[in-house]
């Protein structure tokens, strides 16, 4: 019995220590451990995603990597999210929020935040894709930058490094055109986009700060 109680005590200390280590200052929590896909789930074309030097690399046919870990049971409504991102020339990718796992195709639920500094699509990094688009190029290829998303109620703020590039308020009872019906504030998880075989984009230090 004493040995069992000792085991429970040690186990409790380990779990508490891990939880404290996982939580960063001011409520930030890591979603990616830098070495494995634990807590993530990919739909089609799993080989599009790999891990190199502590970063997720998106390079290959269309694919999406969804967070399905334990933080908030991968269901976020109000939050701050940030990731360090590096694009290579001619690359396109995206970060989804309020989405849900799909086996294939482009996510139908939630919003996409664009990652694109030089690819042919004119919508540049920081765009709330096809909703509030950014034409300016704020960062260069082959340079790490931080892309941040904050959702509070119906308000979305997107930042590139410390610069706000999008402030968007979703109208009440918003109606989207055909094919975009799912682009609405709700709740859900995050996803990383693998856009095409010519695109190679890196993601690391993926963090979330739940606000509810």
Q: Can you say where each PLM-predicted feature lies in the sequence?
A:
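Bacterial Sec-dependent N-terminal signal peptides
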Residues: 1-22
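Carbohydrate-interacting regions of secretory-pathway proteins
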Residues: 19-212
């Amino acid at each position: 019995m004493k040995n069992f109680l000792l085991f429970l005590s040690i186990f409790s200390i380990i779990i508490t220590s891990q939880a404290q280590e996982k939580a960063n200052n001011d409520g930030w929590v890591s979603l990616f451990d830098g070495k494995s896909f634990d807590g993530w789930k990919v739909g089609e074309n799993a080989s599009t995603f790999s891990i190199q030097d502590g970063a997720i690399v998106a390079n290959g046919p269309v694919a999406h990597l969804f967070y399905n870990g334990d933080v908030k049971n991968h269901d976020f409504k109000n939050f701050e999210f940030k990731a360090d991102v590096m694009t290579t020339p001619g690359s396109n990718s995206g970060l989804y929020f309020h989405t849900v796992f799909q086996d294939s195709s482009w996510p139908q639920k939630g919003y996409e935040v664009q990652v694109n500094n030089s690819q042919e699509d004119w919508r540049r990094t920081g765009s709330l894709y096809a909703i509030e688009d950014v034409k300016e190029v704020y960062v260069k290829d082959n340079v790490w930058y931080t892309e941040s998303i904050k959702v509070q109620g119906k308000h979305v703020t997107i930042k590139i490094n410390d610069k706000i590039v999008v402030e968007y308020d979703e109208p009440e009872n918003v109606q989207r055109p055909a094919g975009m019906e799912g682009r609405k504030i709700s709740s859900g998880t995050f996803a990383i986009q693998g856009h095409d075989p010519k695109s190679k984009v890196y993601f690391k230090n993926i963090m979330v700060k739940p606000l509810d």
